[in-house]
Amino acid sequence: ASEDFGAVTKILIQKISKFNLNQKIKIRLITNGSYISNPNIQKALTSIKKFDSEVWFKIDQVRSKEVKAINQINISITSLKKNLEASLSKCPTIIQTCLFRINKKLPEQAALDAYINFLKPYEKKIKGIHLYSLARPSEQPSKDRLTRLTQSEIEDIAVKIQALNIPINIYS
């Protein structure tokens, strides 16, 4: 997280106000959420809330083993919940999820069930879910094991996630 996030947000708000762009520009924070519960980040999010703003909160997996393998971070389910709740408390939040094959295998049903169960308590607060697959070759150490899903495979997964009653957009 940038220590300058609050200052940058303040400048952004000043410029939007100065040029009367309040109804013309959407402020969008795209984040993995790892620092979103930080008081300085929370204060900055509060300041942009009055503008047309939203957070795109990246959640590819919710089980610790998969999160570590895919995103190379150690995060507990408790921390992930805390960070999502911090985002939801400040701005409309869209979940952004990348889906792909690992070792030529589709995402496991158990992983999808964990994802759905994780988001279920927040379904009335989450503005939407964006599903997509790899757009270009991965730069991660496991890149040789990752492959893109087809449009129909993403659509099949979206049908399962629709149990959440959250609007879903598919990008492929």
Segment roles from a protein language model:
Residues 2-145:
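Conserved AdoMet/S-adenosylmethionine-binding subsite of the radical SAM
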Residues 143-169:
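Aromatic-rich peripheral "rim/lid" segments of glycoside hydrolase catalytic domains that contact
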